[in-house]
Amino acid sequence: VGSEMCIRDSQVTVDRPDYSGRLQILGVHARGKTLAKDVDLDKVARRTPGYTGADLANLLNEAAILAARRELTEVSNDEISDAIERVMAGPEKKDRVMSERRARLVAYHEAGHALVGALMPDYDPVQKISIIPRGNAGGLTFFTPSEERMESGLYSRAYLQNQMAVALGGRVAEEIVYGEDEVTTGASNDLQQVASTARQMITRFGMSDELGPVALGRAQGGMFLGRDIAAERDFSEETAAMIDKEVSELVDVAYKRATKV
């Protein structure tokens, strides 16, 4: 009585499973589900780097639900592929009807991403292209990230430059097919991603030609590739101007590389 008890919450960090771990998890969650003979969990495990155990469980559950809705007696590769797409990008927007012209534009946009990605050296292979609206996206191009890159979290300058070119491939395709005046707002998220990657290359990863191997700004939070974070400025206006200039140059080079493809 009268004593104080302090309870401190502990946080346990669980790493995302590697290929072997994903294969085992898929095997566990496949129990009780009737899979078609040509469904290979080994291939599914290789297509899902970065997935958590919960993601994998959700994937197989979604595939089983899709099979039931389609009045199928077993889960086929089609249901697996559709479930992967759903887990990655959200449910299909069935109420969003696209005109033939819009569908064609989205197809060109996504083909631009895929083509640039396929022709960039040592880039992630294209897994699937879809023009089915999901979430806020009119279409999506899926790449299969390298297992080694995902596990190590290490990305080279060349890879990041390729990534920016691939992200700009959709807008470039629109410009080539429809002309500069008909480029749409569909590349908005792509442009944000490219700008974020370029800025991190300069201010976080020490990949600046002008400033050298330095990290600028005191980050507030963890580092996630492709996601901008808040940072306290600890550099001058002159340095800020140099950063903006280099970011612009990196984006311009990436756009030209995508155009040349």
Residue ranges and their predicted role:
Residues D55, G112-H113:
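Short hydrophobic/aromatic residue motifs in ordered secondary structure
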Residues V1-I7:
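Short, small-residue-biased leader/transition segments that mark boundaries at the very start
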Residues A103-Y108, A114-V261:
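Soluble catalytic regions of large protease machineries
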Residues Q11-S81, G90-P91, D95, A167-E175, ...:
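Conserved C-terminal "switch" segment of AAA+ ATPases
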